[in-house]
Each structure stands twice: as C-alpha cells, then as structure tokens.
Amino acid sequence: MALTIVWALWAGWSLLGRATPYTLRVLDDSGAPIAAASVDINDSQVGTSAEDGTIEVDWNRSATVLGVSAAGHVPKTVTIAERPDGLFDVVLKARILRGRVVDPGGTPVESASVIAGPATGTTDAEGRISLRGAEPGTVTVSRPAWVPTTFEWDGGVGESVVEIEPFIARAVHITGEAAEEDIDRFFEMAETTELNALMLDLKDESGLVWYDSEHPVAAEVGATRAVYDLSEVAARAEAAELYLIGRLVVFNDPTAAVRKPEMAVLDSATNQPYQANGQYFLDPTDPDARSYGLGLAMEVCEMGVDEVQFDYVRFPDKRTETTTFDGGVSLETRTSTIIGFLEEAVALLHPMGCAVGADVFGFTTAAGTDDGGIGQRWEEVTGVVDVASPMVYPSHYSTGWYGFDNPNDHPGPMVTRALEDGMERLSRNVVVRPWLQDFGYTPEQVRTQIEVAEQFGMGWMLWNATSDVTVDALERE
C-alpha cells in the first residue's frame, strides 16, 4: 500500500511538471504561412516553423515571452500568460521595398531585376517595384545587357531610387573561319585598343555551326564544324574582362533547308526549298525551325556566352507567289511570328543569365508601321529584346535616303539620321547598339561612324564579312 501511494504521488508530480506542447503558427500579414521562421522562448531558440508555418512549442505552466522572426518581415515579441487552446497565430508584418530604377538620364528602366534577401521581382514600365518580403541590407539591381549595381536599404518605407547604366559594348565581328585561323589576334586587338567586347559567329549565313555543338539537328544536317571550344573561348573572354556576344543566324540556313526540307520555306512550283540569290530560308512559322534556333541559343548560353545576337530573325525579303510558309505570310503573321520567336528567346535565356539581341535592317528605324515584308517593326522588336542592333550601313541605303544621291558618301550624316529616327521611336528604354560599316571605307570614315554612335551614348559593332577589321579606326589603349 505504501509503495502504491508513493508511486501515485510521483506520477502526479511528474505529470504536473511535464511541459505540455501547443501549436504555434506563423503567418504573413497577407495570411500566408511563413516557413523557416525562427521562434524563441525567453530568449532561448526552440526551432523554426515548417512549410505550413507551424511549430510545436512546450508550455511550462508559466508566462512566457515568445520571440518570432523571419526573413523579410518585422520581428515580433508576444507575452503569453496562459497555455493557448488550439492554434496560436503570430502574424508578422512583411517588409516592403518600394523603389524605382532609372538610367543616368532619369528615364525609367523596365524589366530590371531587383533582389533583396529572399525577395525578387522586376520593375514595371515606369521603372517601379514594390517588393514584398524584402530584407534590409544589400539590394542587387540588374538587367541583361546593363551593368549590375547594388545599394544599401535600411528597411525604411520611402521610395528608393537607383541608377543603372547600359553596358556600352565596343566590338568587332569574328567569323568562324577567322576564329579557326587565328582567334588570338582578336584578343590581342582588344588588349591594345578600346574594344571591350567580341562578336563571335556561332552559326552563320552558310548554316554552319562553328562551335562544338551537340545539338542533334546540327549533327543530322552536317552543320557542325567545331573549329573552336566555345566554353574555353568564353572563359578566356571572362578572364580578359571582355563581353562575349554570340551571333546566331536563325532562318537563313541553306545547310538545314536543303537537308531537312520539311523545315524550309518551299517553292510550290517545284516542291523544293525556295531559294533566291543563293539564300535558302528555314520557315519562321515552322515549329521545328524555331526550335532549332532556340535550342542552339540555350546551348551557347549554357557554355558561357553573355549575349545571344539573333541575325536573320526575319522572313526572306525576296519572295514570289509560289513561296509558301506553313503558317502563311500575311503582315500580321509575319510580325507576330518574329516577335513571338524573340519573346520565347527572352523567356528561355533570361533565367540562364543571357541577354537577347536582334539584328534588324537599317530601314526599320524609319519605317513606321511598314515591316518591309520581313516581319521586323522597330517598335515591336525594341519592345521585347534587350539589345536592338540596326544595320545602319550607308552603302545599304538607296539613292534619295535622307536627301543624299549617294548615301555611302556620307557616313556621318547617314548614321546620325538613322539613329535619330530610331531613338525617337523607341517603345521603351532598351539598349541600341548599331552595326557600323567596316568595309569599303577609310579608317577616318569608320571612325566617323563610331563617333556618331558614341554621341548618342551607344556602343557599336563593326561589321566586316571576312573580319578584316580596320584597326586604325580604333583608339589605342
């Protein structure tokens, strides 16, 4: 009997002294559960909340001071006098970073990425962002083809305004053959001149793929030449602090058009791939043709290219009544097809860290709603891509353009007028980096074009089809 009484007294004392748990739930002030919130009792940490915001907390029969904190939220302290019945909710107020991103001239920068601790978002058309759950400290602001920047945020409620600058690339064109022959000379050229970028042919107008691609279509049509290791070139460019732009010719592709005619623009009169002046085009409305170009773009981005510059991202400009496309060739079809391709490229490449550029005919900067029959309209292209590169070669303008009988004789005024037209018609704040003529000109004429571009605050790329760069037009370092 005595032993029974002692055991009963011990059991009762033990039960009374044992901590009894209850369930705490941590919520955001929007009502959403907060995972990984830190919980402490009387300054001693007891654990972190689960995915549903809950955590089991022991109750020790006395008032406790509960501390709860979570990234991106204002910490909260709660005194609990009695054991809660059921769920005990603690609501944390989310910190909100309100900001605006502008360029050095104060113009809003759309689609800039803002990262503040666990919170990420992008700016709207006015350059503004309201970032819920932001963490005080270093905030990173970036946008493809722009120079990333950081600023310190103290968690305050005012609007933070931060400037971000476009990357001003100064590049020359390197063909696949030139890279195979002597790619070193271009790195040496960059080391001794003002160049800070290289434009390297990945796939050119021949349809040949010059890097070590593993894309199955490139292999199937015999396009892969692999004259350079792209990952090694990218690593070398990064070490030399050079911005690497990869030129990818999309739809002008005689290699794939002839060997995979199901992807090609067809001539209904012959039922063969359509060709004009030696050019064969893949059909921009054909899903497989689009997928080929996008697949190569993703591959080169993974290999270290900073920017993919899509060239010949258009319909063929010389067509007859027998030229046929899977999806038709109306104005609406042409423009929506090209913009759709570029939008898909942005969606695929931005998460991989690559900028998206597009080469466009020079006339598009002044063409208004006319797409020239190729699907390129300046306002629409600049509304999608990170970098728009009009080919403002004076030799490509016919008599009468901007009042000149022979536009090629007036490199400075021609480039000036073309860029003025383009800048007046931008649909948003986007990097404009023109292709400049580096063929048939003296060093002084090439330099004149460079100076015009720089007066607009732009970078530039020199085009020479054989990479015979006019080095004397470049400033020496």
Whereabouts are the PLM-identified features?
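Short, acidic Ser/Thr/Gly-rich low-complexity loop/linker segments typical of extracellular
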Residues: P33, S44-E56, I80, P108-E110, ...
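Aromatic-lined carbohydrate-recognition surfaces of secreted/lumenal glycan-active proteins
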Residues: Y243-D253, Q309, R334-G375, N429-Y441
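A short, solvent-exposed loop/turn motif at the edges and junctions
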Residues: V65-T79, T140-E152
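Substrate-binding cleft of secreted/luminal carbohydrate-active enzymes
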Residues: V385-T399, P411-E477
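Extracellular beta-sheet/turn segments enriched in Thr/Pro/Gly and aliphatic residues
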Residues: G12-L16, K76-A94, E152-I168
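Structural motif
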Residues: L24-A35, R98-S111
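Catalytic domains of carbohydrate-active enzymes, especially glycoside hydrolases
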Residues: D184-G207, E302-E307, V384-V387, F456-W460
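Active-site-adjacent "subsite" loops/lids of carbohydrate-active enzymes
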Residues: F167-E181, G246, F251-E299
